[in-house]
Amino acid sequence: SLKAGDVVHFKKGSAFSGNIRLRESGTAAKPIRLTSYGKGELPKFTNPSTRDASGNAITLGGEYIIVENLHFHDTPGERVSGMIIMTRLAALRIERGADHCIIRNNEFIKTGQGIMSAGEHTLITRNYLDGPSYALWRTSKSSWGPMGIHLNIGNQEVSYNTIKNFGTKDSPWGSDGGAIEIDCGRYHKKNIYIHHNYSEGNAGFIESSWDYDWPRFRQEIYNWRVSFNVCYDGQSWLFMLAP
């Protein structure tokens, strides 16, 4: 098992399929770190099945964990349906209570949902995300996704990321998806800082839900700062349903 201060090195050029879940925690002075070493392409991570940890390639269940210099790709989402999966589906997922984590300098390519975080005091920075063009699920009356970064709770910072092509026209609304989505009716939406991101080709930059939260608890937003972002997106720059 891992302990505070440990570093897990993945060799460049290697590939991993399935789920890796970290339950251990680091500390502020000695975080646990997942990173890469060697020469060549970044180590690749995927999980082709939603039956295995909801399609998460890496799941963080502990505090003070850093994930850096890894490549995530082709995690599922197409035609996936069901409310439970909506709160878990992502290439990299930070669970509720897994606070003070840092996700930096990673690549997410064709991941139905790149990063989902329910951890507070999280920093998501300097990642490159290039999404798929399909809906995560679709019916005749509704659709959902794809999304680059999905925040389930407040007290998080998203900065200096490049987020591209998370959007689909396979939707009864004409288009769906987006760069950053902030919803989950179970948790608060206070103190979110989104800055210096580059967003291109997505179905909108930021969406914050209200009646569409699941569970349907209405969480109002407080103390958001959105600044110095560059957006070349379709649909809308900001879709703010929650007051």
Residue ranges of predicted features:
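Extracellular beta-strand/beta-solenoid scaffold signature
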Residues: 21, 47-58, 80-95, 109-116, ...
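Right-handed parallel beta-helix/beta-spiral solenoid domain characteristic of secreted/periplasmic
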Residues: 9-12, 16, 22-86
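Conserved SAM-binding loop
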Residues: 13, 108, 199
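Parallel beta-helix/beta-solenoid
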Residues: 3, 11, 24, 29, ...
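Residues at the loop-to-beta-strand transition
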Residues: 14, 20, 26, 49, ...
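Active-site/binding-pocket entry motifs
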Residues: 39-42, 73, 130, 164, ...
